[in-house]
Design a protein with these regions (language model features):
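Extended, low-polarity transmembrane helix blocks
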Residues: 1-35, 52-57, 61, 68-135
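Membrane-interface interhelical connector segments
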Residues: 34-52
Length: 135
């Protein structure tokens, strides 16, 4: 049986691990759009100043900042909004349920980023290092 006290001491580290994984996965979306790696044919010829291009900038820069845990709360808040907008612009017109309109990932990212906006970066982050030095 799990001892809740022993689980609680690991919570900041698990939060940090979740943040690192989500940041890495998210920055890949921006990398595919802007850098062409990994190559996804639908992003060939993407204009930087289009909505998809601007989303790519947010995904690449924001995903990197989330990955390293720098400015986590404000960046996560912005990315949560970006994913909510992406859902309502690109997926919601295809139907009410995310499983039917292929919007599950946008919804999931939106709420995970919203969680990070409130919970912070956790351990293993630049935010935690800078906060220790300023206290």
């Amino acid at each position: 049986m799990l001892n809740m006290q022993s689980c609680e001491k690991w919570t900041p580290y698990v939060l940090g691990l979740l943040r690192i994984i989500v940041g890495f996965l998210f920055l890949q979306h921006g990398s595919a759009k802007l850098l062409g790696t990994p190559h996804i044919a639908m992003f060939d010829g993407l204009q930087l100043m289009s909505l998809m291009g601007l989303a790519g900038i947010l995904e690449l820069v924001g995903g990197t900042l989330i990955l390293v845990g720098l400015f986590t709360r404000p960046v996560a808040f912005i990315l949560s909004g970006q994913m909510a907008v992406a859902y309502f612009m690109a997926h919601a017109p295809g139907g009410f349920l995310p499983i039917l309109n292929q919007g599950e990932l946008a919804v999931l990212y939106s709420f995970v980023f919203l969680y990070f906006a409130f919970a912070g970066a956790g351990k293993l982050s630049l935010d935690s290092i800078f906060c220790k030095k300023s206290n």
